[in-house]
Amino acid sequence: MGELAPHAAAFLKVAVPASPWWSLTPAEARAQHLASRRPDTGAPDIATSDVDLPRPDGSVLGVRIYGVVGDSPVLVFFHGGGWVYGDLDMADGFCRRLSDGAGVVVCSVDYRLSPEHQFPLPLEDACLAVAWAHAELAGGRPVGVIGSSAGGNLAIASCIVDRDEGTGRIGLQIPLCAVTDHGFDNTSYRDNADGLFLTADDMRWYWGHYLADPAHGSNPRASVLRADLAGLPPALVITAEFDPLRDEGESYARLLMRAGVASSLVRYDGMIHAFAALSAFPVEQARVIADVAAAVDTYLR
């Protein structure tokens, strides 16, 4: 293990939740998240629009579009929050910087949250958003999917569905510190179990709300690490050294390579979980966006 970056250590001192996430009800966790959200100043002032997509049951799925729709590549973004909390405003600054810095249109997805809407309903929302973005924003060209933490899980799972159904809508996947497995026994879980933003107990709590039955954790569209990965789109996998999810993310990248999928793995040493979408890490966030831009240029332009 290396050393925690000094600015990451400073962030952790002020980012301690008032109550451990795992000790709260979902409603309490959502309230705590909103209360602890810090203003993200300095993000580019770019064009945005909110759109409601009809679901088959007559309800609507909200998405937010960043950038001017035209010939630019499209990335569909899924926020983090352990499938339990989060909304379109959670990563608004990141989506603005991503659109501006990578020269893409971003479609951010307000997918349904658990436990009110458990697996596979959030994934169904992800796939609906991908289908709409592919048709309406990209003009039938392949889109990319990108997500942080639980959102990274949805990004990967949407690729699996796209492959299984033969729809060919996704041309690039970018999981950021993604959840890939309903398992908690590896080196990074043990080494980073507590005190580093995301804890092992938090992850057990998140999974407990996402799955109606623990047995669903073996489903390869939930535990994407257990899926057949052959035929998935090219990947840029981002991990953080001081993250319980580091090892499962890196295992996912290695399995993609073994399956013949063009993949790159970038570990950010000294960083903590979800750093890429946090405004507290502007230098690292800019590096991630540059990495994303390079992948987009290779696979989507």
Regions found by a protein language model. Give the residues of each.
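A glycine/proline-hinged amphipathic helix-loop "lid/cap" segment
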Residues: 1-65, 300-301
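Structural signature of beta-strand start/N-cap positions in the alpha/beta core
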Residues: 74, 103-105, 142-144, 171-172, ...
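Catalytic nucleophile-loop/oxyanion-hole region of alpha/beta-hydrolase
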Residues: 87-88, 94, 102, 107-142, ...
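Gly/Ala-rich beta-loop-alpha elbow adjacent to hydrolase catalytic centers
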Residues: 147, 151, 155
